């Protein structure tokens, strides 16, 4: 009988530990470089998968107006939840807008090249103007990670292409953080 109680206690203790570990993961985002971590006091509120394009325009270089390059204009993507349901869109600003009409704009705070040299960088953004009562209305920070594609064309552009626009397919995961309740 002592063994059964001890075994039961061990099982109960193990179960409690597992529940504790699982609970500690709730509200946490992905493993990212230190400079891309959400600030203390914020918890993960929503994760969204983005599929769309990064839009570039052939324009005079900001550092040398006699040279031309592909300059980033805006993103254009649909946002999906983990079940594949469309939950919103991502567009210039940068802005994320939910189907519930809440939205948030972001401002880049930090960046990291990420593990894929052929993909756009990973970012941490500060929320500038969250609005609405929905999923994005309380957002304070946004992470862009797990990027695929989206980089400006490697071949560059010249004056003869000035004003031309190219749309480069990309995918990314966005994590939205709100204040800890």
Predicted segments — roles?
Residues 1-11:
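Bacterial N-terminal signal peptides that target proteins for export
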Residues 12-16:
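Alpha-helical transmembrane segments
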Residues 19-20:
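C-terminal motif of bacterial Sec signal peptides marking the signal peptidase cleavage site
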Residues 23:
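Short, conserved catalytic or interaction motifs in soluble domains
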Residues 26-55, 62-181:
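Primary mode marks residue(s) on the alpha4-beta5-alpha5 output face of response regulator receiver
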């Amino acid at each position: 009988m002592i063994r059964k109680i001890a075994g039961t206690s061990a099982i109960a203790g193990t179960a409690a530990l597992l529940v504790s570990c699982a609970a500690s993961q709730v509200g946490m985002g992905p493993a990212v470089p230190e400079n891309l971590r959400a600030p203390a006091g914020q918890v993960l509120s929503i994760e969204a998968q983005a599929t769309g394009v990064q839009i570039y325009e052939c324009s005079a270089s900001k550092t040398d107006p006699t040279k031309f390059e592909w300059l980033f204009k805006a993103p254009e993507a649909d946002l999906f939840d983990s079940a594949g349901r469309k939950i919103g869109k991502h567009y210039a600003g940068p802005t994320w807008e939910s189907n519930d009409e809440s939205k948030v704009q972001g401002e880049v705070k930090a960046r990291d090249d990420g593990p894929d040299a052929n993909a756009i960088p990973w970012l941490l953004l500060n929320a500038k103007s969250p609005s609405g009562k929905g999923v994005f209305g309380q957002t304070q920070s946004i992470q862009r990670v797990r990027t695929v594609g989206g980089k400006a064309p490697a071949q560059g552009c010249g004056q003869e292409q000035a004003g031309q626009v190219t749309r480069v397919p990309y995918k990314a995961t966005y994590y939205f953080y709100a204040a800890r309740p």
